[in-house]
Swiss-Prot record:
Entry keywords, A to Z: Hydrolase, Magnesium
Top enzyme category: hydrolase
Official protein name in the record: Probable sucrose-phosphatase 3a
Gene: SPP3A
SUBUNIT field: Homodimer.
Amino acid sequence: MDRLEGPPRLILVADLDCTLVDHDDPENNDLLRFNALWEAHYRHDSLLVYCTGRSFSSYSSLRKKRPLLTPDIAVTSVGSEIVYGGGESTVSDVVWTARLDYKWNRDIVVEETLKFPKLEPQPDKSQEEHKVSFFVGREDAVEIMKVLPGILEERGVDVKLVYSNGYAFDVLPRGAGKQGALTYLLDKLDIEGKQPSNTLVCGDSGNDAELFNISDVYGVMVSNSHEELLQWYEENAKDNPKIFHASERCGAGMIEAIQRFNLGPNVSPRDVMDTENFHGESLNPAHEVVQFYLFYERWRCGEVEKSDKYLQNLKSLSSPLGIFVHPSGVEKPIHEWIDEMENLYGDGKEKKFRIWLDNVTSSHISSDTWLAKFVKHELSEGKVRSCSTKVLLSYKEEKQRLTWMHIHQSWLDESSSDDQEKWIF
């Protein structure tokens, strides 16, 4: 949360499975739409929070399978763990962890729940120090929830029980849960003088319901929400104008909520097909780089006309003296790399070629110059290659827009230089 000097314009809190991540959408179309919107318009002054029932290790595994952005905060294990960063570099909130120790004894919870044969323990990867998880049917869950808290209270353990998706049963410390974790984070921001202008919570299942109970937040239940959440809405929130049931699934429903509540820009750059003017907004470096790489993706996929006018437009965006340093170390003028794009037109059409940018930041380093930094991910034939990217941009009065002066990339992780002739920009 220290990334922002002032109060966040928006805190967007999203459940993952079946909310931000649509498991019925193998192409990740709406997730990529959300990614482009967030990086172009929100990353610079807002906070992205993932709030999931998954353990942190399970969440990390999902990041390797889906094009998830790096959040500012990851709330995992149904609110029993808070991690700042949520990517490769993370810091756990030890104060929150210590709070959850109050009237909590995991050994006693395990001992007492073993006496309920209907409770089937979930795999070890789903178990955490402050979360004991089971599978159980709805009717059995209702009966167990009536008696288990009292049994544990007699042994000095104060718990919260969360049932979701028609099968997941979690035993947590009383102060845990998604509501408790988010309330804690909002209180921290308030103490620091960084109370957000708006907060939007997004969910689809029973363990998300308590998020909508937090005062002064906006809430969206995506169209594919589970019956247990819809029932909660009918009984508790149908008259609350700040909470609504979207008509769109998953990420599309989240974008719909941003529009409905007038929380800020709500048109994803992926929904803009103006290839005649594909450069970004005049003084928004984040929007500039997102739009640039979206056009590059569309060129590689053959989704725009193969016309020299587009390549000339690209050249007009960059300085004739501009240099691109390829992640392999090869340096050539940007215009020469643009010329090489002609040979790659449409080569990604059958390869499910996609590009997304993550963690886009920009610094105003002089009166007319910006330095944009981000991670570029490129997916082709199921393989993701990633590089850190720096772009130097200068505002040219005569063009009334930003000009690309220099691009420098470096490979990340296990990304390699195989087929490096097909890696441009």
